[in-house]
Regions:
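Alpha-helical scaffolding segments of alpha/beta enzyme cores, especially the outer helices
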Residues: 21-29
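Short hydrophobic/aromatic-rich motifs at helix boundaries and adjacent loops
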Residues: 1-2, 31-32, 133-135
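Short intrinsically disordered, low-complexity coil segments enriched in acidic
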Residues: 1-5, 39, 166
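Conserved "cap/hinge" positions at secondary-structure junctions
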Residues: 13-14, 144
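Glycine-rich beta-strand-to-loop/alpha-helix junction loops that act as flexible
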Residues: 3-13, 43-48
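Short helix-capping segments at alpha-helix termini
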Residues: 31-38, 66
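Alpha-helix N-cap and loop-to-helix initiation/capping positions
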Residues: 14-22
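Charged (often Lys/Glu-rich) extended helix/loop segments that serve as interaction or gating elements
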Residues: 25, 40-195
């Protein structure tokens, strides 16, 4: 017999249960109904393993002040970092472009709304509160975003991004950003244009 516990584990994050924390608690409950020697325990930790391995780098491409609100438009999207639309917060760090005109006069801002490139209301990625003023050319680097971001990344408005791997402290490009050519590959229409 077997018991499949599925996924949804938090392993790999500080302050959260780690994989070894789950199994003694699970085993204690299962022993009431199953014989350990005759029962296979299956776990599917996928996203919690893959997320730790990936980051997603976005750049601020536009800044808009509307009334008392500041909106930052990025070249990434919530669809890239949270395709299941369930996260309420994101782990990230900033890489500020100090070559920006006015960068030396950055101030702390009470509120900045970080948005993706799409026109959809759900593409508001997060509210950046009481933080340094972000400007065009700054980067927002999202951490722990590997689970499902590659397989569920839509081709909505933008194509798949460049993908890099870090090996021995160096970055290597392993996939080029898609262009219309890759999007149209295997299309009958595209094939006719090539004749």
């Amino acid at each position: 017999s077997y018991v499949d516990l599925g996924g949804g584990y938090c392993g790999g994050l500080e302050g959260r249960p780690q994989y070894p924390d789950y199994f003694p608690a699970v085993a204690k409950v299962l022993q009431e109904e199953f014989t350990p020697e005759k029962t296979m325990l299956i776990v599917e930790p996928g996203i919690s393993l893959l997320s730790k391995a990936s980051t997603f780098v976005t750049g601020v491409v536009d800044v808009r002040d509307i009334g008392n609100e500041r909106y930052l438009i990025t070249d990434g999207s919530r669809f890239n970092i949270d395709p299941t639309m369930i996260k309420s917060s994101h782990l990230f760090h900033l890489e500020l472009n100090e070559a920006n005109p006015g960068a030396e006069q950055r101030k702390t801002m009470a509120h900045q709304c970080v948005s993706g490139y799409s026109c959809m209301e759900v593409d508001r990625i997060f509210e950046y509160r009481d933080g340094i003023e972000l400007m065009e050319g700054d980067r927002i680097v999202y951490e722990n975003v590997g689970g499902y971001t590659m397989s569920l990344n839509p081709l909505f408005i933008q194509y798949f991004p460049d993908v890099y791997i870090r090996r021995d402290g160096k970055l290597y490009k392993i996939r080029n950003r898609w262009t219309p050519k890759e999007y149209m590959q295997n299309s009958m229409l595209y094939g006719e244009e090539q004749k």
